[in-house]
């Protein structure tokens, strides 16, 4: 029974990756229509990458489920080791192109947390798509003890380092914590913003439109390290402002797609890509599938 459930949940994670790359148009991002602001990857690159990562999703679930009573730091290390193996498989499939490194990190944590949660909620093993909003929130909260050490380990001694990564510079200069911060706080953007927004949208519109609306909403609120890396703080803030205006407008699906297509052209010209937003969209879709919202 457990293996079948884990197979089903793993497919939902893969489905989330495929839905995200298929959603079109997405400004600056790879989709079915074009490669966005990327010249080294395509829609098919993302499909290859997703399929390469998929076999590891069961492993993440297994680690969380069968080691649920271990120290959270040890569980994190187990997930990290498997995550690196998955990352290597991704790079092999994409010939060295980084398509899903960030979201693989988050999926390892959230699938691991899902396994941990199932170990304490055996009744859910009989009904994979019977997860509630409370279940999703609890899974996000389980990531907090897994990553309690993460910010201190990665950012605690930056003043002693001679060479800093871009993420480390962002933290020192602006206090932006990126994916590490989101994880260490239990994915509040997903649990308290993206999922409530998506659930509400799905009550009043179709699935595709709801996902496009969620994309716009996320672009208006997310601390997107990819955008900042490519264009700086000013460009990121401008994108947020532009998307907030679009978010607050009441457009038909056709007009929304037209607006997103036009903004895609703008971001391509500026070589800007909201990859952080794309990752959070994937994670939001994963939970929506678990809850049978989509």
From Swiss-Prot:
It catalyses: 3'-dephospho-CoA + ATP = 2'-(5''-triphospho-alpha-D-ribosyl)-3'-dephospho-CoA + adenine. Gene3D superfamilies: Triphosphoribosyl-dephospho-CoA protein. Its EC number is 2.4.2.52. Keywords: ATP-binding, Nucleotide-binding, Transferase. GO terms for biological process: prosthetic group biosynthetic process. It is an enzyme of class 2 (transferase). One of its GO terms (molecular function) is ATP binding. Signal peptide: none annotated. Pfam families: CitG (PF01874). Belongs to the CitG/MdcB family. NCBIfam families: citrate_citG. This is Probable 2-(5''-triphosphoribosyl)-3'-dephosphocoenzyme-A synthase. It comes from Streptococcus equi subsp. zooepidemicus (strain H70).
């Amino acid at each position: 029974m457990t293996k079948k459930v884990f197979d089903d949940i793993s497919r939902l994670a893969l489905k989330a990756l495929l839905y995200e790359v298929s959603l079109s148009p997405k400004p600056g991002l790879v989709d079915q229509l074009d490669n966005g602001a990327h010249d080294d990857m395509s829609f098919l690159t993302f499909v290859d990458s997703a399929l390469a990562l998929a076999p590891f999703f069961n492993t993440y679930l297994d680690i969380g489920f069968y080691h649920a009573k271990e120290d959270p730091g040890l569980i994190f290390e187990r997930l990290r080791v498997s995550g690196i193996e998955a990352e290597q498989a991704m790079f092999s499939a994409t010939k060295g192109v980084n398509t899903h490194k960030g979201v693989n990190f988050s999926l390892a944590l959230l699938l691991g947390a899902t396994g941990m949660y199932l170990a304490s909620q055996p009744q859910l093993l009989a009904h994979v798509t019977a997860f509630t909003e409370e279940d999703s929130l609890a899974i996000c909260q389980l990531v907090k003890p897994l990553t309690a050490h993460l910010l201190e380990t990665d950012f605690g001694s930056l003043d002693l380092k001679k060479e800093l990564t871009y993420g480390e510079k962002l933290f020192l200069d602006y206090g932006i914590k990126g994916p590490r911060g989101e994880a260490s706080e239990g994915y509040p953007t997903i649990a308290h913003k993206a999922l409530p927004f998506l659930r509400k949208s799905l009550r009043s519109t179709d699935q595709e439109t709801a996902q496009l609306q969620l994309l716009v909403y996320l672009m208006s609120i997310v601390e997107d390290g990819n955008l900042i890396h490519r264009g700086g703080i000013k460009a990121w803030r401008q994108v947020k402002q532009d998307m907030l205006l679009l978010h607050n407008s009441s457009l038909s699906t056709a007009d929304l797609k037209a607006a997103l297509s036009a903004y895609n052209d703008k971001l391509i010209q500026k070589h800007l890509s909201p990859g952080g937003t794309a990752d959070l969209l994937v994670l939001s879709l994963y939970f929506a599938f678990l809850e049978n919202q989509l």
